[in-house]
């Protein structure tokens, strides 16, 4: 089964870094996406806020460059996480992160 998502946007919540009891580093943040997409011949506004988690040592170096306001593209897979309150939320598990040059 295919499960791939590529999403570009702006980091809107400060990254939270943790290390699991087994020593695996994790970085969590929220990515806000806004764009205009074409659907059925019409233009529509597309907007979402997607929680992102980066796990493992491979991508941790780039997470130290990510702050609120950073523009990035994230590639990975989606999965549901159950919160302590019992509600499920969709999360993007990042496998590749690219900083978008602001042009400054």
Curated annotation (Swiss-Prot):
GO terms under biological process: DNA replication initiation; DNA replication, synthesis of primer; plasmid maintenance; replication fork processing; response to radiation
InterPro entries: NA-bd_OB-fold (IPR012340), Primosome_PriB/ssb (IPR000424), Prisomal_replication_PriB (IPR023646)
Occurrences of domain SSB (ranges): 2-101
Assigned keywords, A-Z: Disulfide bond, DNA replication, DNA-binding, Primosome, RNA-binding
PTM comment text: An intersubunit disulfide bond is seen in some crystals.
Induction comment: Induced by hydroxyurea.
Annotated phenotype, changing residue 39 to A: No longer interacts with PriA, still dimerizes and binds ssDNA, altered binding to DnaT, does not load DnaB replicative helicase. Does not fully complement a priB deletion in a priA300 mutant in vivo
L45 loop, short sequence motif: residues: 82-89
Alphabetized GO MF terms: identical protein binding; single-stranded DNA binding
Gene Ontology CC: DnaB-DnaC-DnaT-PriA-PriB complex; pre-primosome complex; primosome complex
Signal peptide (UniProt feature, chain positions): none
Keyword ATP-binding applies: no
Recorded phenotype for the gene knockout or disruption: Called priB302; no growth phenotype, 2-fold decrease in recombination proficiency. Inviable at 10 ng/ml ciprofloxacin. Resumption of DNA synthesis after arrest of DNA replication (upon UV treatment) is slower than wild-type, no change in survival after UV treatment. A double priB-priC deletion causes a drastic reduction in cell growth and/or viability. Strongly reduced UV resistance and greatly increased SOS induction; when associated with 'R-230', 'Y-479' or to a lesser extent 'P-557' in priA. Synthetically lethal in combination with a polA, priC, rep or lexA deletion.
Cystine crosslinks: 48-80
Effect noted on mutating residue 45 to A: Increased binding to DnaT, loads DnaB replicative helicase
Domain notes: Displays high structural similarity to the ssDNA-binding domains of single-stranded binding protein (SSB). Unlike SSB binds ssDNA in a shallow groove on its surface where DNA contacts both monomers. The L45 loop (residues 82-89) plays a significant role in ssDNA binding. PriB's binding sites for PriA, DnaT and ssDNA overlap on the surface of PriB.
Family membership: Belongs to the PriB family.
Function: Involved in the restart of stalled replication forks, which reloads the replicative helicase (DnaB) on sites other than the origin of replication; the PriA-PriB pathway is the major replication restart pathway. There are several restart pathways, the PriA-PriB pathway is subdivided into 2 distinct pathways. priB and priC have redundant roles in the cell. During primosome assembly it facilitates complex formation between PriA and DnaT on DNA; stabilizes PriA on DNA, presumably by preventing or inhibiting PriA DNA translocation activity.
Assembly, per entry: Homodimer. Primosome assembly occurs via a 'hand-off' mechanism. PriA binds to replication forks, subsequently PriB then DnaT bind; DnaT then displaces ssDNA to generate the helicase loading substrate, which allows DnaC to load helicase DnaB onto the fork. ssDNA is displaced from the PriB-ssDNA complex by DnaT. In a PriA-PriB-replication fork structure, movement of the PriA CRR domain exposes a surface to which PriB binds and contacts ssDNA emerging from the PriA pore. Binds PriA; binding is improved in the presence of ssDNA.
Record protein name field: Replication restart protein PriB
């Amino acid at each position: 089964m295919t499960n791939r998502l590529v999403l570009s946007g702006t980091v809107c919540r400060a990254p939270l870094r943790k290390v699991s009891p087994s020593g695996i580093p994790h970085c969590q943040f929220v990515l806000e996406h806004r764009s205009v997409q074409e659907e059925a011949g019409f233009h529509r506004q597309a907007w979402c806020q997607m929680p992102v988690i980066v796990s493992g040592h491979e991508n941790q170096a780039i997470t130290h460059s990510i702050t609120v306001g950073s523009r990035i593209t994230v590639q990975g897979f989606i999965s549901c996480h159950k919160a302590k309150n019992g509600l499920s939320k969709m999360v993007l598990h990042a496998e590749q992160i690219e900083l978008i040059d602001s042009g400054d």
